[in-house]
C-alpha cells in the first residue's frame, strides 16, 4: 500500500512539474506538431473586416512539411500572409531561437491554461513577443497572441475535436489590428469605395476571421504538385 501511495504521489508531482515548466509544455506541443507530415481539410471562412464587405465562402486547405501551404477557394478572401496554423508550430520547433517563461495561469473555457511567453533571442526578428495559453491537461494551445513589428498583434482562439492528437483545430478565430495590418491593394480599393464613415485614425479597429475545418485527411503523402497554382 505504501509503495502504491508513493507511486501515485510521484505521478502527481510529475504532472505538476510539467505544467510549471514551459520547456516541458513546448516539448509536448512539438511532439504533436511532428506527428503531422501533411494534411488536407475542407474549409469554411467567415469574415468581419471593418470597411470591407466579404462574403463567407467554402474552400479547402492543404499543408505539407516543412512550409508548403495553400488555400483553395474562389473569390477574394482576407487572411494574414502567414499560415495561421503552421506559423506557430514552425516557430516553436526552433527552440534555439527563443526563451520561454510562464507568466501566470488563467481559466479559458473551463480549462486551466499556463500563459507561456516566447521571447526571441535576436532583437532583429519580425516577432516581438508570442504569448500562448496552453491547456495544462491536454497540452493544446487554446489562445495565442503574436505581436510583430509590422503587423501589430494577431490573436487566435482555437477549438479542438477529434484531431486534437495532432493539435489540429476544428475552429480558429483570428482577430487582427486593422490599423497595422497591410491590406492587399485590391482590398484597399474596396475599402475606399464602400467605407463612407469618417474613421478616427486613433481608433484601433479589429477584424475577425472565423475558420471552420472538417474532413481532415492526415499524412496521405501529398504531392508537391498539389501546391502549384492553376489558372481557371
State the predicted function of each range:
Residues 112-227:
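Gly/Pro-enriched, hydrophobic low-complexity segments
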Residues 33-47:
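A short, Trp-centered hydrophobic/proline-enriched beta-strand micro-motif
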Residues 19-27, 31-35, 53, 67-140, ...:
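Flexible, processing/modification-adjacent segments and terminal tails
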Residues 48-50, 179:
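Sequence/structural signature of outer-membrane beta-barrel proteins
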Residues 28, 58-64, 155-164:
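Extended lipid/amphipathic-ligand handling interfaces
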Residues 40-43, 54-58, 71-73, 157, ...:
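Extended beta-sheet lipid-handling architectures
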Amino acid at each position: 500500500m505504501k509503495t502504491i501511495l508513493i507511486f501515485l504521489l510521484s505521478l502527481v508531482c510529475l504532472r505538476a512539474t510539467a505544467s510549471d515548466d514551459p520547456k516541458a509544455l513546448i516539448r509536448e506541443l512539438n511532439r504533436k506538431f511532428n506527428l503531422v507530415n501533411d494534411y488536407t481539410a475542407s474549409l469554411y471562412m467567415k469574415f468581419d473586416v471593418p470597411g470591407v464587405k466579404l462574403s463567407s465562402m467554402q474552400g479547402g486547405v492543404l499543408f505539407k512539411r516543412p512550409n508548403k501551404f495553400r488555400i483553395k477557394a474562389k473569390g477574394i478572401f482576407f487572411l494574414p500572409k502567414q499560415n495561421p496554423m503552421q506559423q506557430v508550430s514552425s516557430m516553436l520547433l526552433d527552440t534555439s531561437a527563443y526563451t520561454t517563461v510562464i507568466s501566470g495561469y488563467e481559466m479559458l473555457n473551463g480549462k486551466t491554461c499556463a500563459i507561456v511567453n516566447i521571447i526571441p533571442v535576436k532583437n532583429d526578428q519580425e516577432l516581438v513577443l508570442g504569448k500562448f495559453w496552453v491547456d495544462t491537461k491536454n497540452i493544446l494551445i487554446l489562445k495565442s497572441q503574436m505581436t510583430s513589428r509590422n503587423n501589430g498583434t494577431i490573436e487566435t482562439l482555437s477549438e479542438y475535436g477529434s484531431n486534437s492528437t495532432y493539435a489540429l483545430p476544428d475552429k480558429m478565430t483570428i482577430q487582427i489590428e486593422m490599423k497595422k495590418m497591410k491590406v492587399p491593394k485590391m482590398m484597399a480599393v474596396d475599402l475606399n469605395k464602400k467605407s463612407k464613415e469618417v474613421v478616427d485614425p486613433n481608433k484601433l479597429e479589429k477584424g475577425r476571421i472565423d475558420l471552420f475545418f472538417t474532413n481532415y485527411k492526415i499524412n496521405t503523402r501529398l504531392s508537391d504538385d498539389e501546391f502549384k497554382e492553376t489558372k481557371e
